[in-house]
A protein has these predicted regions:
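Divalent metal-dependent hydrolysis catalytic cores, especially in the metallo-beta-lactamase
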Residues: 2-30, 46-59, 86-98, 114-116, ...
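Generic structural signal for well-ordered alpha-helices
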Residues: 3-4, 28-35, 79, 106, ...
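Active-site gating loops and adjacent loop-to-helix segments of metal-dependent hydrolytic enzymes
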Residues: 5-14, 59-87, 129-141, 152-165, ...
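Conserved, mostly hydrophobic/aromatic
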Residues: 7, 53, 109, 138, ...
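Short, electropositive alpha-helical surface patch
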Residues: 27-42, 105-114, 250-257
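Active-site core of metal-dependent hydrolases
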Residues: 80-206
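His/Asp/Glu-enriched, well-ordered alpha-helical/loop segment
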Residues: 157-167, 184-196, 201-286
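Short, compositionally biased
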Residues: 294-302
Length: 305
């Protein structure tokens, strides 16, 4: 409820919450809690409309801020039990396609929700194979995957050929501003989804926090593990949009990347992502500085006069 209310006050009206790599018992508890919270929506903050199952089907070599003690090969029954406990709230499942059993996993899960490549060592050919099996999305492009090079384009190169949507962390820390501009130019403003990957330090002061059972230190807005690995973000989505525009992304493109594009990626665009008849009455009124002046959620003013 605290997260929802904070996001709502920042201008975020809908969010899809990401998990981390944990044991099945913990993830089923998280899934159940998400289902209960979503059912109790009172339009006082951002609506929780889905879950991104970010872990545990990852490469340990590209674990990022995930704990490797929970990382396992793709397991459909594991996913199914967590999703059942959530009431089918899982909208995306992340997977490293080079892992044992990954392609069979993608075949099955892609019939139920989006499958996204993430935390991977996959090369271009493996990524293309994954797309052919049903992957359609890329989680936080460039981060926790091999870099794009002219002889080894990797996941990034495969995404430019096949992905329906790619995510971009636009906090000014995970991705260089020039790369942000390049991604919008290459992929177009219909495919890019701005994400925050914000963790519990978002909206709070610098200091020591925790993420997935690991200590995280936030200094000058940058969140890292003890070894210096970037550990999520302390920046909310609304600020990511403002930074994208500051970096040179056209305002209309940045706004699409934070509204209808992610709604389509999560397959919840029938209820949110744009102002249309039959959809949620979620409206954000901003000035030229993109700072909210009034926020309407479910037809109810939750910020501004």
């Amino acid at each position: 409820a605290t997260i929802s209310k904070y996001l709502g006050q920042q201008g975020v009206t809908t969010f899809v919450a990401a998990t981390m790599s944990f044991d099945e018992g913990t993830l089923t508890q998280v899934a159940h809690a998400a289902k209960e919270f979503a059912a109790e929506d009172n339009c006082e903050g951002a609506a929780l409309r889905g879950i991104n199952m970010e872990g545990p089907f990852f490469s340990k070599a590209k674990k990022g801020a995930q704990s490797d003690k929970y990382i396992i090969d793709p397991d459909y029954d594991f996913y199914k039990r967590v999703n059942d406990e959530s009431g089918n709230m899982i909208k995306l499942v992340d997977v490293a396609p080079e892992l044992n059993g990954a392609m069979d996993f993608i075949d099955k899960v892609s019939k139920e929700c989006r499958v996204s490549i993430a935390h991977t060592e996959a090369d271009y050919d493996t990524a293309v194979e994954a797309f052919n099996h049903g992957v359609s999305h890329i989680t936080h492009l460039f981060n926790a995957m091999p870099p794009f090079t002219h002889r080894d384009p990797g996941v990034v190169g495969a995404a430019s050929d096949y992905a329906e949507h790619v995510e971009l962390i636009c906090d000014g820390i995970h991705i260089h501003p020039a790369v942000v501009r390049t991604v919008f130019k290459i992929f177009g403003d219909d495919k890019v989804c701005l994400i925050s990957v914000s963790m519990r330090a978002c909206g709070l002061h610098d200091g020591e926090y925790s993420l997935g059972g690991q200590k995280v230190y936030v200094k000058a807005g940058k969140a890292t593990l003890e070894n210096g690995t970037i550990a999520g973000s302390a920046t909310c989505l609304a600020e990511c949009v403002r930074r994208a525009v500051k970096f040179g992304v056209p305002m209309a493109s940045a706004l699409k990347a934070a509204t209808i594009n992610p709604a389509q990626a999560a397959r919840i665009d029938d209820v949110c992502g744009s102002i249309e008849e039959g959809k949620a009455a979620d409206i954000l009124i901003m000035g030229e500085d993109l700072v909210p002046k009034m926020i309407i959620r479910g037809g109810k003013i939750i910020y501004g006069a």
